Structure formats: C-alpha cells, structure tokens
C-alpha cells in the first residue's frame, strides 16, 4: 500500500526533535549569574558604606548654601580623593596628624604666595622690587582656615572629636612653624585676631560716667541728722510765723502801751505850756 498524503507529514512530525536538554540548560546558568551579580552588588554597597562618603552625598544640597559650607564640602572631597590616591591607599580611620601634615605639604605645589628662602636677596622684604626664583607656597592663613573647615567636616561626617586628626597637636605645631617661617621670609608679622567683643569695645567712643558721690558713714549720719533738724526748724518757724500772723497782739509792729501813754502826756504838757504863754502875752 502507498502511504497516504498525510503519512509523510506525520513522520516528519515524529522526526522533529523536541526540546532537548541542551536548550533547557541555560535557565539554571542564567539564575546562577543573577545570584552572583546580586552578591557582587551587595559587596560593593558594603564597601561603599564602610568608606567615608563625601559631604555632598551624605545630605541633599540645601538651597542657598553659604559660601563657607560650599568651600567646606569641596575641601572635604579633595581630602578624600587624596586618601584614595595615596600610596598605599589610606582610609579615614587610619588617618593621623602626620598624614594631615603630608596633605598640607602636598597642597604647597598649588600655592600662589611667594616665600623667600634664607639665601634670597629679598628675604624679609614685604615688597621685593624684582622677581626671584623662590618657590610659591600656600599662605599660612589659607592653611589655617583649611584645617578649621576640615576639622568641622570630619565631625559632621560621623567622626569622633577625640580621634579627629585635624585637631592633633602635631598639626597645630606645624601651623605655628609655618606662620613664624613665613613671617620672617615675607617680612609680614602675623598678629593675633582680636575678639569681636574687644574690637567693638575699642571702636566704641568712651562713655563718660559721673563718679558716684563719696559718702562717709559719720558725715552721712551727721548730715542726715543736721538736715532733718534744719527741716524741723524750718517747719517750726513756719508754724510760729503762721501763729504770729493770726495773733495781732503778738505782732512786732505794734508799739508797747507804755510808750503811747508817755507820748500823750508829753503832748498834753506842751499844749498847757502853750496856753499859759498865750495868756501871759494877752494880759501884758
């Protein structure tokens, strides 16, 4: 018998291979690759968490950030980059005052301040008339301000104040030596900044305050008692004057009675003498 037209198709269908084991094998391999990638990403996250993060990544940037805060973040990120590029690489917990001093010396190559050497002809002159071959350095004021910002940034990033490498005694000594050396080389003495309260008090005009009266205890007692006595005398005089005004008989302007009688008798005698004289003249 000849095969029906559908027979070859059925045979062909039977001859088509089904899904082989090699085709189903990539599924477990892909899952294992995903697990390995997941483990690697977790390990990277742990390493990043262990390393100190820049201040820009620790907190979102605030709107209207001050100039000081912006400069502090830039300085902190620069220091972290210096630690990563250090040979061998350094971590922040292992950083000490000696590493901070190395960082300050590393920054001298970017300085813009001329610091004359001991053998320079312009050593100690603040305004040299001509250029010289002395190197450029970071000014002491810039280094001092930089250490202040890094010291604050270290504590803001989670560091403990007692382990702050920027507050180490060696760093303070180094800054003092740099200040003295640059003051001699440049001929510019550095003066300590006055506090704001002292500067305001010096700038304010002097306030004239009247001295308090000097009072002695015995004089005070005597004066008080004397004043009280005078007040009492004045009051008594006032009362006596009022009594004199209300009593006419006691007025000092009223003449005594005896003087009035004597004056009247004298007037009568004078009148009698005048009458007698007129009578004698008439009779004659």
From Swiss-Prot:
Keywords per UniProt: Developmental protein, DNA-binding, Nucleus, Transcription, Transcription regulation
GO biological process, one term: mRNA transcription
InterPro entries reported for this sequence: ALOG, ALOG_dom
Region (Disordered) location: 1-69, 209-284
Main subcellular location: nucleus
Subcellular location: Nucleus
GO MF annotations, alphabetized: DNA binding
Residue ranges annotated as motif Nuclear localization signal: 192-196
Any Pfam family the entry gives: ALOG_dom
Location of the ALOG domain: 67-194
GO cellular component: nucleus
Biased composition (Low complexity): 13-32, 40-63, 246-284
Protein family (similarity comment): Belongs to the plant homeotic and developmental regulators ALOG protein family.
Summary of the function given for this chain in its UniProt record: Probable transcription regulator that acts as a developmental regulator by promoting cell growth in response to light.
PANTHER family per UniProt: PROTEIN G1-LIKE2, PROTEIN LIGHT-DEPENDENT SHORT HYPOCOTYLS 6
Name by which UniProt lists this protein: Protein G1-like9
């Amino acid at each position: 018998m000849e095969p029906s037209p559908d027979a070859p198709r059925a045979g062909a269908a039977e001859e088509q291979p089904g899904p082989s084991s090699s085709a189903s094998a990539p599924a477990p391999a892909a899952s294992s690759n995903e697990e390995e990638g997941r483990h690697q990403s977790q390990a990277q996250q742990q390493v990043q968490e262990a390393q100190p993060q820049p201040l820009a990544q620790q907190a979102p940037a605030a709107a209207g950030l001050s100039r000081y805060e912006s400069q502090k973040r830039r300085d902190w990120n620069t220091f972290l980059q210096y630690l990563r590029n250090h040979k061998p690489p350094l971590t922040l917990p292992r950083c000490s005052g000696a590493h901070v001093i190395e960082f300050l010396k590393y920054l001298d190559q970017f300085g813009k301040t001329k610091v004359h050497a001991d053998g320079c002809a312009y050593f100690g002159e603040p305004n040299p008339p001509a250029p010289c071959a002395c190197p450029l350095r970071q000014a002491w004021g810039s280094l001092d301000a930089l250490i202040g910002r890094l010291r604050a940034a270290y504590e803001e990033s989670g560091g403990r104040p007692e382990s702050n490498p920027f507050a180490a005694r060696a760093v303070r000594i180094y800054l003092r030596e740099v200040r003295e050396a640059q003051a001699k080389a440049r001929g510019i003495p550095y003066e300590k900044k006055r506090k704001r309260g002292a500067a305001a008090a010096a700038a304010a005009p002097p306030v004239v305050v009247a001295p308090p009266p000097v009072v002695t205890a015995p004089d005070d007692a005597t004066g008080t008692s004397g004043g009280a006595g005078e007040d009492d005398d004045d009051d008594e005089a006032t009362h006596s004057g009022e009594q004199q005004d209300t009593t006419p008989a006691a007025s000092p302007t009223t003449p005594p009675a005896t003087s009035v009688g004597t004056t009247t008798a004298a007037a009568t005698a004078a009148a009698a003498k005048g009458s007698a004289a007129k009578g004698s003249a008439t009779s004659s």
